[in-house]
Amino acid sequence: MKYDFSHTEKKWQAYWQEHGTFQAEEGQEKPKYYVLDMFPYPSGSGLHVGHLEGYTASDIVARYRRSRGNNVLHPMGWDAFGLPAEQYAIKTGTHPSLTTENNIRSFRETLQAMGFSYDWSREINTTDPGYFRWTQWIFLKLYEMGLAYQSEVDVNWCVELRAVLANEEVEEKIAEGLTVVRRPLRQWVLKITAYAERLLLDLDGLDWPENVKQMQRNWIGRSEGVEVDFELRCHRKMLRVYTTRPDTLFGATYLVISPEHPMAEKLATAPQLVEVKNYISKAKLKTELERTGLQKDKTGVFTGSYAINPANGEALPVWISDFVLTSYGTGAIMSVPAHDSRDWEFAKKFGLPIVEVVKSPHDVQDAVYEGKDSTAVNSSNSEISLDGLAFPEAFERMASWLELKKCGERKVNYRLRDWIFSRQRYWGEPIPVKHYEDGSLGTETDLPLRLPEVEAYQPTETGESPLANIPEWLYGTDGKGAFRRETNTMPQWAGSCWYYLRFIDPRNSEHLVDAEKEHYWMNVDLYIGGAEHAVLHLLYARFWHKVLYDLKVVSTKEPFQKLFNQGMILGEDGEKMSKSRGNVIPADHVLEKYGADAVRLYEMFLGPLEQVKPWNTNGIEGVSRFLNRVWRLVHPDTEGPAAVLDEAAMPGELLRRMHKTVKKVREDTECLKFNTAIAEMMVFVNDLHRTGNRNREAIETLVLLLAPYAPHISEELWEALGHPESIARAPFPTFDPALAANDVLTIAVQVNGKLRGTFEAAKDASKEEMLEAARAVESVRKFIEGSTVVKEIVVPGKLINFAVK
C-alpha cells in the first residue's frame, strides 16, 4: 500500500475530533502539564509557514507529555480585538465582528489541518462578551485598588490611525512610516509602577531566556541614587535633581530640566523668555524616541537662571533640553560632562565647562571618561573630601553628607512608566465607567458592557472614539443621576493579559476561574512565543497576574514558569516574510502539496528551535522521502497489505541501537532539541533498512518515538500493526540504561602527568589496544619519540599516562 498523506490526515483528524482525544481531564489524579502558545491575532492574511513553527513545537511537547502520563492542557483561542479589523471596517463598512469571525474560521481550519492536539472544547475569543465581561471585571478591581486612574497626559498620537500608542509601540509604527506626535489627552492609566519592584525581583525565579529577563530588567530600569536640592539664585526655591552618581557632584557644571518641568518658563529671564517658549513648543511635538535617541543632535536653550551647587557653592547655569524627560526622576538632572557622554556632547556644543572629578587616563577636554574603576579627584570642601575614594565609598560618603546637610536624600527610581490604557477606537473592550454631571465617577454593575452597533468607525477629530457619536449608548441615568459613559476602549493587550486563566475554566459564568481548578493547573509549565513580546505582553500579563494574586484570585505569583522563544523562519530569500517582499509562503499551499506531517517534521528539522532559519522547499521534499521510508518498514509492498513482522528477539546490535535511539529522542524532546531528535530517528530508520530487519519491537518503538512529531502517519502505522486504540494514548518507549550506554569512550593521554591528547576507544578494548592507540595520537607521539618510556599506567576507560625520561 502506498502512503496517501491526504487521506490519512483527514481520517485521523476526524477521529480525534469525534473521540475528544485531546480534551484535558477534569480529574486531578494525574500530574498536570500546561503547555501554551501565545494565541494569535486572526488577521485577514491567514497563517504562513513561519507562524506554524511555535505551534508545532508546543504540540510535540503536549503529545509527548501525554505519552509520559501527564494530564495535559493544550488550548487555543483568539486575541481578536485590534486595529486591523477596525481599519478594514473603516474601508469597507464591514463590522469588525464579521471580519474577525471569518478570519478565525480560516485560522482554525489551518491549525486543525496541521493535526495540532488542541483541546478545542476550551476555545476562547477575547471579543466574546462572555470573555470580556471578566476583562472588564479585572479593570474595575484595578480601579477599586487605586491602580487605574485618569490623567491628562501627553500621549503618543498616531496621526494616520487617530489613536494613542503605548511607549512600547512607537518605534514599530514609525518604522512602518506612520506619523507619531505628542499631544495632551485625557487617558486612563494603570499604575504598573506600583509593582515595579516585585516585577523585577520575581524574574530571578523564572526559567526564561536570559535575554528576555534582561530586557524586562532594563525596561523596569531600577536605579539607586540621590535626589539633590540646588538653591535657585534669585528665586528663593529649590530645584531638585536625581542622580545615580552623587560622587561626581563636585564636577557638575550646569543643570538641565525637561521642557515640561513646571518651572521651565518660570526660570526664563526676560531676555530668554521668547526663545524658551519657542523651544518648549517644538519639544511638545516630538516623541520620546525622537527626544532620547543617543545619536540625535543635542538641542537646548539657556533659561538665564542659575542654581547653587551645594558641594562647592558654584553658580550653575540652568538649561532646558528635550533629552530630559519629566517622567523619569524629577525631570531635572545635574550634568557632569567629564564623566557622562551625553553631558560631554552637550557641553562641547554650548561651550560649557568640563571638570574632571574621577581620575581619568586621558584629558577629559578631549574625550569623556565614564569608568567607575578609578578614584575621585578635585572633590573636597571644608566639610567633606572624596579624593582618593573608589566609587562605592565615594557614593556613600556624599549621600550621607547630603542627608546630614538636609539638601539631599537617597532614592530608588524606575525607568518604567505607568501604562496608558486608553484607546480612542471602537473595536476594543468598553471601559465600564460612568461620568456624572457633578464630575464624580461610577462603575457599571451589569457586566458585560457591550459595544453598540455603529455606522461609522472613524475616530473623531477631537480624539474621542466613535462611541462618542452614539447618544443612545452614550447617555443614561441611574439612581445617582444622569451620566455619560466612558468612550475610550481598552488596548489590544487587555484580553491577552489573563487569557491563560480562562482556558482553565472557559465556561464559568460565576467566577473568572474556579479556585480549585486554578490551583491544580497554574502556573503554565511551558509558554512558547516570540521574544518581540518581552516588554509588552509578557510584562503586562505579569502585572495583572500579581494584582490577581493580591486579590486571591490566583495562587501563584507568576503566570509562566518556563518561557521559550522560537526563532523566526525566513523566506527562501533569507528575508523576513512579508507581503511587500512577496516572499510569504502560505501554510495552506505547503499543506496541500506535502501534508501536515512533512511540514511539522521539516520545520523542526530546519535547525535549533531558537535560531533564525530560512525556508528551503528542497528540504521539505527530503523529509517527505523520510516519511515514505518509515511507511515502507510496515508496507514494503506498495500494492499489498502490511508486512508480517518478525516476533523473535532482536539481534544484540539492533537492540542496543534501539535503546540508544529511545534515550536520545527522549532527552532531546524534553530539552526542545527537536532537530537532533529527528536526526536520531532518521539514523535508526537507515539502520532498519540497511539490515533488512523487520523486528516488531524495533518498528513499533520507532512509530511511538515518531508519534509526537508526525502523528498522522504514526496513527496509521500503529493501526496497521494491530493496535485498536489511538497511539495518542500509548506510553512513550522506555530504555535500558545499560543497553543505551555509549560503547565508545574518550581516553585522556598524559605524558609525565600532563595532558597531551585524547582518543576514542571501545569500552571493552584491551590494554594493549589502548596503548597502541595512545602512541598513535600525533600530539602525544612528539613527546615520547626519542625518549625512554620508563612506565605505562593504564586506568581502564579513563586515561593512560606515559612516564618518560
Swiss-Prot record:
Q: Which residues bind ATP?
A: K579
In this record, what's one Pfam family?
Answer: tRNA-synt_1g
An example molecular function term from Gene Ontology annotations: aminoacyl-tRNA deacylase activity
Q: According to its UniProt record, where is this protein mainly located?
A: cytoplasm
Matches recorded under SUPFAM superfamilies: Anticodon-binding domain of a subclass of class I aminoacyl-tRNA synthetases, Nucleotidylyl transferase, ValRS/IleRS/LeuRS editing domain
Motif ('HIGH' region) positions are 40-51
Q: What is its EC number?
A: 6.1.1.4
Assigned GO CC terms: cytosol
Please give the catalytic activity noted in the UniProt record: tRNA(Leu) + L-leucine + ATP = L-leucyl-tRNA(Leu) + AMP + diphosphate
Alphabetized Gene3D superfamilies for the sequence: 3.10.20.590, HUPs, Isoleucyl-tRNA Synthetase, Domain 1
Q: Which GO terms describe its biological process?
A: leucyl-tRNA aminoacylation
* Record keywords, A-Z: Aminoacyl-tRNA synthetase, ATP-binding, Cytoplasm, Ligase, Nucleotide-binding, Protein biosynthesis
Compartments where found: Cytoplasm
Q: Where is this motif: 'KMSKS' region?
A: 576-580
Q: Which superkingdom heads the taxonomic lineage of this protein's source?
A: Bacteria
Recorded hits in NCBIfam families, A to Z, give: leuS_bact
Q: Which family does it belong to?
A: Belongs to the class-I aminoacyl-tRNA synthetase family.
Q: Which PANTHER family match?
A: LEUCINE--TRNA LIGASE, MITOCHONDRIAL (PTHR43740:SF2), LEUCYL-TRNA SYNTHETASE (PTHR43740)
- Name by which UniProt lists this protein: Leucine--tRNA ligase
